[in-house]
Each structure stands twice: as C-alpha cells, then as structure tokens.
Amino acid sequence: IIDKAKAANIPLVFLNREPLKEDMAKWDKVYYVGAKAEQSGEMQGKILADYFKKHPEAYHSNDGVIHYVMITGEPGHQDAVLRTEHSVKALKAEGMKVEELASDTGMWDRVKGQEKMAAFLSRYGDKIDAVICNNDDMALGAIEALKAAGYFTNGKYIPVVGVDATTPAVQALKDGTLLGTVLNNAKKQGQAVFNLSYVLAKGETPNKDNTGFDIVDGKYIWVPYEIVTKENADKILGDK
C-alpha cells in the first residue's frame, strides 16, 4: 500500500494498527494515528497495584506476592505482546512482587477467555490472586468462569482487568465484577485522522497548530489511553 501511495504521490494515514518502523520510513508522507499498546499494559498494572496496596488481604497466600494468570490475545500480535509485557513491568515498577502461575491465549475471544479461566481455576484454584487479560472480551469470559466457581458472591473475589472499555465491560465495572479497564479513545483517534487528512488534502505540512495534536517524529499522532474504573466510568465514557 505504501509503495502504491508513494508512486501516486498520495499521502497515507494508518489508523490503530501500527506498521513496522521500516515501512513507515519508506516515505515522508506516511502517517500513523493510534495509541501505544505498552501504555495500556502499564495502566492495567497500575490498576492492580493500587488495588493490592489498598487491600493487603487480597493476597490469597498471605505472602505479599501477586500470583496471577494471564489471558493473551493472538500470538505474535503486537498489542498482545506489549500489553502482556508492560502490565507485569508496571506491577514491578510499583513495588509489587509477582509470580505468573499460567498464561494462555484466548485469541481476543470471550468464550475462549472463559475456557482458559476455567482451566486455570481447575489447576490453581484459590492460589490465583489476579487475572490480567489483553482485552475486555476475554476478561468478561474469565469473569463468567469465576462466577461459575462461586466468585463475586459471599465476599469471594479475584480482581480482573481488561482493555477497551467496551459497553459490556463498563457494566461489569458497575456490577463490581471487573476491577478496571483501559479506554482506547476512538473518538479522539477519529478526530485526529480527520484533522490530519484535511491538512494533507490541502497540501499543507501537519503540525500541532493545524491538526490540534502533537506530531511525533513528523509521522505519529499518539492518543493516550485512559484508566477506567467503577468510580470514573460515567465521566470517562461520557467524553468518548
């Protein structure tokens, strides 16, 4: 696509799935609008760290170590790799001791998330302190498996975090079954794409003044993720 756009001298804007840096470097009129996947992982780690700092009783083994399970997206997918890596890095950066009990792919899918969580519960049971999922659909699936195992009733609880702030996930936040999620702000990304494309169509060089967004390295507009919890869900989503 980049080669064809370059040959036709047509500016090209990619959205939400970042091309490789070497592809972005092929031409000076290629742009990307999106969010940094590592930031979403960092925010998941922050949500969990805040929870365990406030709830020391949440360590099921009473050893001060967060024993977690990870349900990941598509193997090799950049978002899955970065969210997985940086959620754990953020926990450690917050001073948390962590141990991975198990990790498996749920392929971004709710049913597969439920299946993987059921398998984790069968093997590890109450040893699990936290569930980290690369997206909300898998987190909601994990919650279904936890409900079937008696969690979220009679004080039995495991914190679950996801990414995307989907409508069903926000309902789970309000229900108290999902601890937190991270918003990939589609509205702001759409505005950035429109502003950028408009400037390019006029033959101008994009900058913060004419797009309203910082242009990093002359090619990238990064729209920050936002932490969403039960406490701020209505406000954050009202701004979407």
Label the model's feature ranges.
Residues I1-L12, H86-S87, L101-A172:
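Hydrophobic alpha-helical
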Residues I2-Q39, E57-V65, T166-K174, L178-L179:
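Flexible loop/hinge segments that line or gate small-molecule binding clefts
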Residues E18-E22, E38-Q39, E74-Q78, T105-R110, ...:
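Solvent-exposed loop/turn segments at secondary-structure junctions
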Residues Y32-G64, G113-Q114, A165-A169, N185-E204:
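Hydrophobic alpha-helical segments within soluble ligand-binding/sensing domains
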Residues S40-Q44, Q78-K97, K112, K116, ...:
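Short, solvent-exposed amphipathic alpha-helices that sit
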Residues G64-P75, D79, Q191-K240:
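Hinge/cleft segment of the Venus flytrap/periplasmic-binding protein
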Residues H67-M70, L91-R110:
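Short beta-strand elements in bilobed, periplasmic/extracellular small-molecule ligand-binding domains
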Residues E144-K187, Q191-D217:
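Exported/periplasmic ABC-transporter solute-binding proteins
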